[in-house]
Amino acid sequence: MSFEQQLISWRRELHQNPELSLQEVATTARIRDWLQSGGLTLLPFDLKTGLVAEVGSGDKVIALRADIDALPIEEATGLPYRSQNEGVMHACGHDIHTSVMLGAALLLKEREAELPGRVGILFQPAEENFGGAKTLIRAGALEDVSAIFGMHNEPGLPVGEFATRGGAFYANVDRFVFKVTGKGAHAARPHEGKDAILLASQLVTVLQSVASREVNTLDSVVLSVTRIQGGNTWNVLPESVELEGTLRTHSSEVQQRVKARVSEIAAGFASAFGAQIDVFWYAGPTALVNDARWADFASDVAAQAGYRTHHADLHLGGEDFAVYLQHIPGAFVSIGSASEYGLHHPAFNPDERLIAPAAHYFAQLAEQALQHI
């Protein structure tokens, strides 16, 4: 079996056996077995899921990171190696990322004697719930590390294309929940109640004006309501309704201004309708900010490796690789996966031809980065 065939085989085994965040027990066991069969050293961190391998010796240390968890999505690809776990799918390509870094680890192991330092390869759990990076950092995965690199497959780019940027790349992620409390009533006698559904509906509409009319159009911001829940029958106005959604920004100043304005609007609506609106915010990862030097370096190495390189657009998705970059410099990059369907879609099907070239790229990137720290 060729190197490429081996990586694709591993990817398909991971794809058939996806596991949700913090449940990646079998995934971790598979990765451990594959790494140990390749002679890799595993660091003795106290982790329930996920693991860290290391190649090389010396004081200089570079890290590579892959995420290993899947999503609660029922797969609809029809592939012969489709998910065997009902309602769970690698719909974000973390099986691809893991296979790439497994390949990079094996390539680095072959050149271990020539490496001018050490490379840590982080197989991180729980990216989808934004907790895994903190778990690895607490375990000590960044100890002595000077720079870190990671990737995401990009379905909108053809295979063989690469993009990154210095500075802000991915967004701040905030989740919000509004609990709108009015007064229940018979549907035929709405005047006897305070219609929480009507209030919630108007609130959804007005919230859109914050992003479109109160923020500079040059600033990136998305405010999306993604869930409305209230009532359980057709002839009763419910007492309460919940709204849930997300705010995405790149600037912390815009983030705080929008959050404050949303709370003001909620308070104003509550007063005007004689109702109560409680607003709860839950912080996800902060904006992912690439180190400009390392982003340029990663792009230069990609060009050497034969990729067609691009300056990436700003991305409003969330990515907890941002947490690593709050501690040490590094760069996150996009590598084309040419899928007709996008990330988190039940028919998402990335092109496996990206895996082996990306493995060679990250091995080359790590080795050259060691020479520049």
Where are these regions (language model features)?
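Non-cysteine beta-strand/loop elements that form the S-adenosyl-L-methionine
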Residues: A63-R65, F176, F332-A338
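Acidic/His- and Gly-rich active-site-bordering loop/insert found
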Residues: M1-H90, D95, S99, L106-L115
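Divalent metal-coordination and catalytic microenvironments
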Residues: L14, A53, L64, H94, ...
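Active-site beta-loop-alpha junctions enriched in small/polar residues
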Residues: E19, D67-D69, A126, E154, ...
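General structural feature for long, well-ordered alpha-helical segments within catalytic domains
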Residues: F3-W10, Q23, T27-W34, K60, ...
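Histidine/acidic-residue-rich, glycine-tolerant segments that coordinate divalent metal ions
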Residues: L51-V52, L71-I73, L79-M89, I96, ...
